[in-house]
């Protein structure tokens, strides 16, 4: 979820909420498995790996990298010696959103409710992988418009409406954004190199060092060290 996307939907909530905005940077790499896990745990990825190895999934593992989000939230609550009652929900589709709307009264008894709206993340990936979505969101203005249309007509807006007026604080945030890259850089690696387009991890990577931000000592950046880790795109993009 990008800042410009937030600006696009903010006025839809203005009737129901007042706003207090703050800006912050995502960690690197700007990928869900690192950035979102860090937000929920309140820790850098390397700290998660060391303190809660059972909750950290290595880069080369075939296991889902974001299956431990609720336990990571629990670790942060316990680390700060709080006794919050909380719930965790990941909204993948409209059916789950409808289910969430039906249980809003019971959720209001919790001190913390965490809701992951996966559509925006799915949209950013589909913009790269799906030809139809590429056509619909071929410009930044079109991308923002698509986000607004979804928000305006989805059950998500209804969820915000039902919470409004109950005296609760709602925090709308994101783990990372997206950048449309017009000048991609080529990073060549062996068969063990990961396939993620946002960043590359590998022992033998060939690239132009002038165009790629590389991290040769991942621990210095708070990252686990399966091998050398490099991130892209380059600053000029």
Task: Describe each PLM feature range.
Residues 2-5, 47, 121-125, 178-182:
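Flexible loop/turn segments at secondary-structure boundaries
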Residues 230-237:
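Conserved small/polar residues in nucleotide/adenosyl-binding loops
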Residues 131-170:
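A long, amphipathic alpha-helix that forms part
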Residues 1-28:
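Segments forming glycine/polar-rich beta-alpha architectures that bind adenosine-containing cofactors
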Residues 1, 159-188:
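Metal-dependent active-site segment of extracytoplasmic phospho-/sulfohydrolases and closely related
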Residues 28-142:
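His/Asp/Glu-rich, glycine-adjacent segments
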Residues 191-208:
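Acidic, His- and aromatic-enriched active-site or binding-groove loops in soluble protein domains
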Residues 8-16, 128-135, 181-196:
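Short secondary-structure boundary/capping segments
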